[in-house]
Amino acid sequence: MPFRKGWTLIELLTVIAVIAVLAAILLPVFHQAREKARQATCISQLKQLASATLMYAQDHDEVLPCFWDYYDGEGKFGGWIFYSTFAQCLPGNFDPSKGSIYPYIRNAPIYTCPSDRCRQGNSYAYNGALSPNPVAKVGPGFHFGLPLAAIQEPANIILFTEEETGHGSTDDGHHLPEGNYPTTRHHGRSNFAFCDGHVKALLPDNVPSQNFRYWP
C-alpha cells in the first residue's frame, strides 16, 4: 500500500490564507454585482411608475396626478400615493393601492426599491413642482396636477426620484427641493425618472435645480 502524505500545518495555513485573500477580493465584487442588479430593478420600477403616471394623464385630459398624499376613492382624483401616518421607518406607512396611478400598475411591491432598508411601502418621491398649488387643497375632490402642455422640456424635467428618508422630515412621497432630498442608495447615485418616461442614475449634487421645475 502506498504511503499517503498528509497536510502539514504550514500547507494548511497557506491554503487558508489563499482562501481568505480570494474572499477579500471577491466579496466586494459580488456585493457590487448584487447592488447593480438591485439598481437595475429600481430603474425598471421607476419606468413603470412614470409610464403609469403618463397613462393616468392621458385618461384625465392630459393632466398629471397631484403629489399630495390623500385618498379620494378608487379611480378618482387624489394623490399619486396615499400616506397613512407621519412616522418614520415604520412598516406600512404607505398604501399604494389608494393612489391615483395604482389602477395602471396594480403591483404594490414596485413602489419599494430593493435597496431601501426602511421598508415603509414606498421609496420614491413625486416632483412637488408638478402640482403647482398643493397648499390650496381643502379636501377630497380637488385636483392640482399640472397639464402636460405646461411642461416645456419633458426630457429634462424630473417626475420621480428616490427620496431620502430621515433627513429632517418623513419620507412622505413628494419631493420639495428645499425640504426632502434625493437619496444615494446606489453607489452614491440616485435614480431619476423624467417626464418623457426615461430614467437615469445621477449624482444628486449634479442635478441642476431647474430640473425640478416645469419651466426652463
Where in the sequence are the language-model features?
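Short, well-structured segments within or immediately adjacent to enzyme catalytic domains
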Residues: 40-216
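Amphipathic alpha-helical segments typified by the pilin-like N-terminal helix
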Residues: 3-44
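Short intrinsically disordered, low-complexity coil segments enriched in acidic
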Residues: 1-2, 49
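Short alpha-helix boundary/capping motifs
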Residues: 2-3, 59
